[in-house]
Structures are given as structure tokens and as C-alpha cells.
Amino acid sequence: MTKMIVGLGNPGDKYEKTKHNMGFMALDLLANELNVDFKEEKPFMSLVASTFVNGEKLFLVKPLTFMNESGRAVAPLLKYYNIDEADLTVMHDDLDSPVGRVRLRQKGSSGGQNGIKSVITHVGSQTFNRVKIGIGRPKHGMTVVNHVLSGFDNEDKEIAQDGIFKAVDAMKFYLENGDFQKTMNKFN
């Protein structure tokens, strides 16, 4: 069985440390721990790394389409590698959770997250795993766009980093046992 873990974010130095790039940050850490490097796959508008974990093929994917068009990269990769959407996990930022809180879900709506909305639209299914990493709500007077495209202030940086570590620990646990429900039970 082949699995794919996608980290959502925006490409480019300008966005590298923004809240919206929590998925990219978590996937970068996971790739580092698995000792794999990303290579650009231009036809798929993505950075892709691949390896084997417990004898199963694993693809790590960072779409280069910008957040709101992530599905345009993810759907063709699933089709090309013949991966079922149930074996897809998407890591992303979550406005509705406090900074650093990690929540795992097996299916559901986008919850207003435009990258997830794009994946649902292009994949044609809501039945894929999600790892939501909390970034909190905007402070009074700040727009959602400005909030997600800003970095973490000093008091939240460490908490956000802890969330990234927890998300990666959850993914390593999932890759070891292959059971997302069991992973949810342990990490939610």
C-alpha cells in the first residue's frame, strides 16, 4: 500500500515562516527525520520526496500552487501513483484551534480552510486524513488574511513549534502502525 502525506503552505521565502505554512513546516521536519530530500516535480507543481517505511512506499508532497489551489497538485499525484484518498493525509494550519494544538480527523468539510477546500474539490472526496495544527484566531482588529500571512509573535513561537513536533510524532506513529484511527485515539 502506498501512502501520501501532503503539507499545505505557500511557496517562497516571503511566506516561509507564516502561520499558513504550518503544513510545510511539519512536512519539512518529517522529511528531515526520515532523511529524505524534496525534488521539484514540475508536471505536478510540487516538491516531492519518497521513501519506504515498514516496506510501504511513502510520498511527501509540498504543492507549489499556493494554498488556495493545492488540490490542483494533489489530485493528479494521487491519480498518477494510484493512491486511494483514504491513504492521503494532509497537514495544515487551523484557525479554530489554539496555537500549537493538534487535532486529527479522518474526513469532513474544509472548515473554511481554502487549501483543504481545494483538495476536496479536485480529489472529489472528503474522505482523507487531516492533521490540523492550531494557529489561533486573529487578534482584535486583524483580518484573517493578515493573521495567516503573519509570523508568530515571541510568546507563541515555542508553542507553535511544539505543535509541529506533535504533528510529526503523530505521523511517525501512523507510519509505524498504519492505522489512522489508532493514531487519532493516541494524539487527539
Curated annotation (Swiss-Prot):
It catalyses: an N-acyl-L-alpha-aminoacyl-tRNA + H2O = an N-acyl-L-amino acid + a tRNA + H(+). The record marks 10 as: Discriminates between blocked and unblocked aminoacyl-tRNA. The keyword tRNA-binding applies. GO terms for cellular component: cytoplasm. TRNA binds at residues 15, 66, 68, 114. The record marks 93 as: Stabilizes the basic form of H active site to accept a proton. It is found in: Cytoplasm. Its main location: cytoplasm. This is Peptidyl-tRNA hydrolase.
